[in-house]
Amino acid sequence: RALGPLIPSRLFDQFFGEGLLEYDLLPLFSSTISPYYRQSLFRSVLESGISEVRSDRDKFTIMLDVKHFSPEDLSVKIIDDFVEIHGKHSERQDDHGYISREFHRRYRLPANVDQSAITCSLSGDGMLTFSGPKVPSNMDPTHSERPIP
């Protein structure tokens, strides 16, 4: 959503399966570009950060909203230089009927992330946080050696 909340977003985006809010049904907010696009003026304010990747100088972090999944429904793996996050739950009833959900996310790890020090946690409000420290560029992240002056 780099262009802001006023630009139409794809219907099948990260909010798929979330249900509609009242402002989604107002004609003022409907898009005239295509039936597969819609404007969601306030959703980015209400639900920002659904999937956020940060690569700071010292740390690499992925934050992913998985509130519809229990810990048993989630799988987090490192395969080669990628983090793979998979979630799936069977059909269950919610406010709008019956729904089943499944997602698969794959993120490339920066080369300088120390894979042996990666942590992953799930908060009570359903936010999955995956993070790992970065090693200085003159060090190999797979080794714990460092030059001593």
Swiss-Prot record:
Membrane-traversing stretches: none
Predominant place of localization: cytoplasm
Matches recorded under SUPFAM superfamilies: HSP20-like chaperones
Residues noted as binding Zn(2+) 3 in the record, renumbered to the chain: H143
GO BP field: lens development in camera-type eye; negative regulation of apoptotic process; protein refolding; response to heat
List of residues binding Zn(2+) 2: H96
Keyword set, alphabetical order: Cytoplasm, Eye lens protein, Metal-binding, Nucleus, Zinc
Subcellular location: Cytoplasm; Nucleus
Domain sHSP: 41-149
GO CC terms, sorted: cytoplasm; nucleus
Function: Contributes to the transparency and refractive index of the lens. May act as a chaperone, preventing aggregation of various proteins under a wide range of stress conditions.
Family to which this protein belongs: Belongs to the small heat shock protein (HSP20) family.
Subunit structure of this chain's protein: Heteropolymer composed of three CRYAA and one CRYAB subunits. Inter-subunit bridging via zinc ions enhances stability, which is crucial as there is no protein turn over in the lens. Can also form homodimers and homotetramers (dimers of dimers) which serve as the building blocks of homooligomers. Within homooligomers, the zinc-binding motif is created from residues of 3 different molecules. His-89 and Glu-91 from one molecule are ligands of the zinc ion, and His-96 and His-143 residues from additional molecules complete the site with tetrahedral coordination geometry.
Designated name of the protein: Alpha-crystallin A chain
Organism expressing this protein natively: Anas platyrhynchos (Mallard)
